[in-house]
């Protein structure tokens, strides 16, 4: 009898937890593609690889929301990245390297604490026809020395971040993020500050963002190491004409050491065709501190929806470089098996083609 009462008490406690918790969801993405790259070098110029995370980073995540009453909710996200081609974890082996935050939401907006996407990355992603992915996206353009260094230079995610996002106010929304450097005796080093504002109404989307990073020696940031006071400004927008969605964006990156002065322009389009979309973009980058420091990426792709959760995709990119630039198409937003990448050289033309499948669950 005592055992029965104990069992009922345990079950009752679980039921109480379940009733208080509005929802807990496990979700994920598995994304795999066959890709071939040619960096234009005289020797060892080509590589064929099976890689993970081309259109979207492969991941496993957990998210939940608890209704606290009065329009207030508590929520969390724990999301880990993986290389589906090898089964290994990504983001430097950190357990929840993609996202890990807890927060409160309500009529005042949303406040999140933890590792999360930066406002400027979300702004860039909302304008890019490739969603900063596949091989034509702005996130898939980098240098051999800088790793996943995007054309716009935006940090994907930041640690130790306090983020406030407004609710939608007549089409307007905004976000402010402050990331603590957590260095003894220095409140500046390692700090990251980001803000963004967006107007979205009907066919129109306009967004602007700014990010300032102070000497972040963090391998989990993207780019991996940012020099003193790196400042990034971004403005972009889209207009949906139904037959085509046009996109235009501008970015500028500078730092206090006068080692970076990049200007970037992106012109793109999304054309609905059948159960999918044709994607196209041109991205131009110029380093004003370097003579012959220009690069241009031309990309085209297609996504084909097999269902609401599964799609096929393919894309091709061609990146041309002046004598003192070595940009090229990385595989996509990642994570990736680094062995699948190929070194890039100044003044060379890099091409990449892939075909893959993405499944969401």
Tell where the protein language model's regions lie, with residue ranges.
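Outer-membrane beta-barrel "beta-signal"
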Residues: 345-361
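Outer-envelope beta-barrel architecture signal
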Residues: 4, 22-28, 66, 70-74, ...
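Transmembrane beta-strands of outer-membrane beta-barrel proteins
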Residues: 27-33, 77-79, 114-116, 175-179, ...
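Outer membrane beta-barrel
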Residues: 22-36, 47-181, 189-191, 198-205
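Gram-negative bacterial Sec-dependent N-terminal signal peptides
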Residues: 1-21
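Outer-membrane beta-barrel architecture
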Residues: 9, 61-63, 101-103, 163-165, ...
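Detector for outer-membrane/organellar transmembrane beta-barrel domains
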Residues: 194-304, 317-318
């Amino acid at each position: 009898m005592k055992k029965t009462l104990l069992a009922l008490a345990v079950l009752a406690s679980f039921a109480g937890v379940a009733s208080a918790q509005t929802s807990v969801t496990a979700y994920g993405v598995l994304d795999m593609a066959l890709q071939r790259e040619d960096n234009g070098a005289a020797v060892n110029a080509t590589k064929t690889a099976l890689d993970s995370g081309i259109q979207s980073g492969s991941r496993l995540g957990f998210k939940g929301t608890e209704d606290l009453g009065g329009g207030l909710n508590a929520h969390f996200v724990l999301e880990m990245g993986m290389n589906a081609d090898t089964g290994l974890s990504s983001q430097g082996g950190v357990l929840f390297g993609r996202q890990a935050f807890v927060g409160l939401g309500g009529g005042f907006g949303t406040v999140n604490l933890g590792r999360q996407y930066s406002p400027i990355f979300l702004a860039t992603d909302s304008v890019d026809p490739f969603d900063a992915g596949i091989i034509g996206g702005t996130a898939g353009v980098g240098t051999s020395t800088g790793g996943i260094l995007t054309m716009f230079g935006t940090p994907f995610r930041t640690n130790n971040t306090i983020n406030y996002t407004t609710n939608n106010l007549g089409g307007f929304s905004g976000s402010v993020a402050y990331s603590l450097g957590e260095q003894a005796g220095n409140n500046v080093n390692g700090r990251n500050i980001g803000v963004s504002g967006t107007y979205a109404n009907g066919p129109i989307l306009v967004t602007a963002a700014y990010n300032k990073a102070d000497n972040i020696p963090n391998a989990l940031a993207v780019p991996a190491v940012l020099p003193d006071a790196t400042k990034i400004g971004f403005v972009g927008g889209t207009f949906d004409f139904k037959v085509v969605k046009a996109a235009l964006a501008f970015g500028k990156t500078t730092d206090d050491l006068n080692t970076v002065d990049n200007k970037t322009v992106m012109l793109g389009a999304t054309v609905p065709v059948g159960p999918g979309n044709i994607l196209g973009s041109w991205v131009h980058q110029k380093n004003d501190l370097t003579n012959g420091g220009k690069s241009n990426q031309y990309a085209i792709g297609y996504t084909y929806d097999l269902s609401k959760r599964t799609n096929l995709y393919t894309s091709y990119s061609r990146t041309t470089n002046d004598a003192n630039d070595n940009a090229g198409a990385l595989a996509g937003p990642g994570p990736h098996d680094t062995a699948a990448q190929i070194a890039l050289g100044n003044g060379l033309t890099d091409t990449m083609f892939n075909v893959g499948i993405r499944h969401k669950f």
